[in-house]
């Protein structure tokens, strides 16, 4: 998770102090380096799971300390960086007056001295990526027998800010619970990414196998369609 701590620094940035007087070595501002971080996930990750992990970070990071406009700039810079558009990434960083002591987006400071940290998974995919399941595989998930398992309520927290209790059955797969959520809230299954305790839940997992304690919350990241830009009138 990204973090933010209050500091004060000038353009030289050699040493600055937090409010408690503790020195923080920032180093001079450096241009963004082109080298992408190489990292390995704790588990083999699909492209969809990586997107969900990133969505979760960008949805929650601005809720902590730091300025939203800086988080927005960092998100845009991270996207440009991963797309190998280093000139655009550097222009975004410069335009937002963001300082990079080590030339990397993993540690940044705004002009007020606030610190921002981007996780490596927002900057590059892991070396152990695996292929996404095809739609045909999802369609192959068998329907559970009618009335199989026991009925229960599952607490969900949507990234839209809504909390709800969904009636499910213990024999349901994650995919079938997504369909239940679609019936209740109109959210397409393909737009849902489910997480429990930070772990992504794949479509074929069954609720009874997940052993989710009663009243624990399952996070659902809802992918929002990108709105069409509003035309600017002359």
Curated annotation (Swiss-Prot):
Domain of life of the organism encoding this protein: Eukaryota
Record field: compositional bias (Polar residues): 12-21
Feature: compositional bias, Basic and acidic residues: 32-41
Region listing for Disordered, in residue ranges: 1-47
Gene assigned in the entry: ubtd1
Domain called Ubiquitin-like: residue spans: 152-227
Lineage summary: Eukaryota, Metazoa, Chordata, Craniata, Vertebrata
CDD domains, alphabetized: Ubl_UBTD2
Protein name (record): Ubiquitin domain-containing protein 1
Chain segments annotated as coiled-coil in the UniProt record: none
Job description of the protein: May be involved in the regulation of cellular senescence through a positive feedback loop with TP53.
């Amino acid at each position: 998770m990204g973090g933010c701590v209050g500091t004060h620094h000038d353009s030289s940035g050699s040493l600055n102090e937090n409010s408690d007087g503790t020195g923080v070595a920032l180093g001079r501002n450096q241009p963004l380096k082109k080298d992408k971080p190489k990292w390995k996930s704790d588990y083999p990750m699909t492209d969809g799971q990586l997107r969900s992990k990133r969505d979760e970070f960008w949805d929650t990071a601005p809720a902590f300390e730091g300025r939203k406009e800086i988080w927005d700039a960092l998100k845009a810079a991270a996207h440009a960086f991963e797309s190998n558009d280093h000139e655009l990434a550097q222009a975004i960083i410069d335009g937002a007056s963001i300082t990079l002591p080590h030339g990397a987006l993993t540690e940044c400071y705004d002009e007020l001295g606030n610190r921002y940290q981007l996780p490596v998974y927002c900057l590059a995919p892991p070396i152990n990526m695996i292929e996404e399941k095809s739609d045909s595989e999802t369609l192959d998930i068998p329907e559970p027998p009618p009335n199989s398992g026991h009925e229960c309520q599952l607490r969900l927290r949507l990234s839209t800010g809504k909390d709800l209790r969904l009636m499910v059955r213990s024999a349901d797969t994650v995919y079938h619970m997504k369909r239940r959520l679609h019936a209740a809230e109109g959210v397409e299954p393909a737009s849902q990414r489910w997480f429990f305790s930070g772990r992504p839940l794949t479509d074929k997992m069954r609720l009874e196998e997940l052993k989710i304690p009663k009243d624990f919350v399952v996070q659902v990241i809802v992918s929002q369609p990108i709105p069409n830009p509003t035309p600017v009138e002359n």
